[in-house]
A protein has these predicted regions:
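Short, highly charged C-terminal tails/helix-capping segments
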Residues: 156-161
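Soluble non-cytosolic domains of exported or imported proteins
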Residues: 23-27, 90-93, 131-138
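Charge-rich, low-complexity N-terminal segments
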Residues: 2-6, 12-60
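Long, continuous compositionally biased terminal/linker segments
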Residues: 55-83
């Protein structure tokens, strides 16, 4: 029984967990976004919120770069994400299945369904090393914005995000 408890504790310790952080912005996020030349605002959680304009058909897309990081052993990553669907109603099953099928075709990132209070969201997320350089961060920002916008257009026909 002691071995089972010890194994359970070790397994729990190995699961990815958020790094301890307060609600201030991460200096690494600030530095890399400024180095790239992006303008952004910092939300209440300390995350960087960007509006990516100039997408197809004059569209734009919101995306966030998390200030908090995830730790798995020695590996530290952060999420870059965008919402393509936000509604009081859950995403219909056939559209959720479509997102799951799309996941297999992406080089980076995946779709997940989340609930924020009473609202349901389809969120595209890419995890990058927390200390990723500007070239990598810029590539991921563009991938997140373009993917989020294309799927928002496909799911809703709108440009709300």
């Amino acid at each position: 029984m002691k071995k089972v408890c010890l194994v359970s504790l070790l397994a729990a310790a190995c699961i990815s967990s958020p790094a301890m952080a307060d609600s201030t912005k991460d200096a690494r996020v600030d530095a890399v976004l400024k180095d790239i030349g992006y303008k952004y605002e910092v939300d209440a959680d300390g995350d960087a919120k960007l509006t990516m304009g100039g997408l197809s058909d004059g569209r734009s897309q919101l995306l966030w770069v998390n200030a908090n990081t995830n730790i798995l052993g020695e590996y530290e990553s952060r999420d870059l994400w965008s919402i393509a669907y936000l509604s009081e109603q859950p995403l219909p099953d056939e559209k959720a299945k479509m997102l799951l099928e799309k996941n297999a075709s992406y080089k980076v990132g995946s779709w997940s369904l989340k609930k924020y209070g009473s609202r349901y969201a389809a969120v595209f997320t890419v995890q990058v090393p927390a200390n990723a350089d500007k070239k990598a961060v810029n590539a991921v920002i563009m991938a997140v914005a373009l993917t989020g916008d294309a799927v928002e257009k496909e799911l809703t026909g709108k440009d709300d995000m």
